[in-house]
Structures are given as C-alpha cells and as structure tokens.
Amino acid sequence: MQARNAKKEPPGGCLACRYRLGALSHTAAARYDRIAQLLIPGYSSLARLGVALLATSPLGVMPGASILVAGCGTGAELLEARRQRPDWRLTAIDPSPAMLAAARERLTSEQGNAGEGIAWQDTRLEDLDSSTGFDGALAVLVLQGLPDDGSKLRFLTALARSLRPGGEVLLVDLMQGEKSALQDQLAAARLAFQRAAGPLDGEKIANDEPLRGLTEAVHPIGSSRLAALVEAAGFSDPAPVFRALDYEGVLLQRLA
C-alpha cells in the first residue's frame, strides 16, 4: 500500500497527540514506554495480547499474513509481532517521521535486523491507498486522541477500508464509562493507580508532547457510541478482549 500523493497536515494531533513530535531518540522512546507502563494499567501486555489475537484470527493465522500497525508509536507492537510471527509482512504507519525513526532504531537496538522487511510510511491512515487489503491491524491508544467531530468515524472508516473482508483489528483506548454507580470509583482508581507508581516529574510530562498525550488531549467515548461508530464504518459489533479500569480493548472484524 502506498500513501496518496496529497498528504494533509493532521488536524488536532493527527492519529493521536502521542505521535506528534519534533524528534524522538531511542532513549526517549524507551522512556515513553516506561512511563506508559506506570500510567496505564496493563500497558506492558497490550502488544503481546494484540499480536496473539491477530495470530489466531482467520486471516492472520495464514503464513505471510499482511498486518498493519496504525500509529506505530515507539514500535512495541512491531517488536512483539517479530517475536511471535516473524513471517508476517508488516506495514507501520505514523504521521511523525521522527516517531518512525525512533521505532526503527528501537527494533535495531533490541532485535538486530528486525526492522528490515517492514514497510515504513509517514502518513495518516486516511491517506493510505486501499487498493490492497491487510489481513489484520493494530491501533493501540490511537482513537482516543481523535475528537468525536467526524474524525473518529473517518479513522475507523479508513481502517475498515484498509482491511480485507474478514480482517480483524484490535482497538485499545481510554473509554468514557457509561452511567453507573461504580464509574466515579473507576476514574478515581485510575488516578490512584498512577499516583501509586511513585513521583513523576509533572513539569517534564507537561512539556513533553508524546507523554502529555497519555494524560491530556484525549477524547474518550462510551461503549454505546463506539458501537455506533464501528457499525457505521463497516465493522462487526465490538468484542471485548481487555479491560483495566477505564481502558478497554475490543476486537473488530471487517464485514464483507
């Protein structure tokens, strides 16, 4: 798949505010992941979970399956895919060339030539040519960075368009709880979980755009709204596969 020639500046942080940077070194990428593990419950298992789910999907189980990592960030999902399924043909997209460079550097540092054979594209998903469909996709902490002003639907529609019929995608995002007696407790517990990680330099996080994307400028939606959006985009009903406080992961399948 190739990016279309007309490349637009991503509005409001593009795929997610987590990915808009000027430069990001391998050291900074590793720091991002360490802090994400402290702030997001279950973060350290998300890449392993996502790859395992796609590896057992009807299309992803096939040798040489084509997998898209939308908003590849610091490369956690790419590393795990190389560990579990070295036969997969991977495409990594991110609107930030600096983030792509950091992910490539990380794969080289941790797995030697693991970055070879990956198609790297600094583009938005919406600008990706959909002439050839992927067998599966991962989009972790991406949708939460898009406002619900049509941006979420455009992203999901482009995601469905990029997949072959029957292809599956894992979404993981901060969600807005439905009205319940326990919802306030879940939100309070998330803050307590983050505080229990120990002192973090709030000033440094506030001035660090990718880290700020973990706690600010997010646009969570409820499960009923997500269900409506994925249906409009051409996906099956969301199947819950992960939940840790108010972070949720769902598996979607593109309908024929």
Predicted regions, residues:
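A short beta-strand submotif of the Rossmann-like class I SAM-dependent methyltransferase core
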Residues: 139-143, 171
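C-terminal alpha-helical "lid/dimerization" subdomain adjacent to the S-adenosyl-L-methionine
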Residues: 174-232
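Conserved class I S-adenosyl-L-methionine
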Residues: 2-62, 80
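Class I SAM-dependent methyltransferase SAM/SAH-binding core
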Residues: 66-70, 74-127
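Core SAM-dependent methyltransferase catalytic element
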Residues: 233-256
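A short glycine-rich, Lys/Arg-flanked "PGG" loop and its adjoining helix->strand segment in the class I
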Residues: 153-165
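A short acidic, Gly/Pro-enriched loop at the edge of an enzyme's catalytic core
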Residues: 128-137
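Conserved beta-strand signature within the Rossmann-like core of class I S-adenosyl-L-methionine
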Residues: 166-173
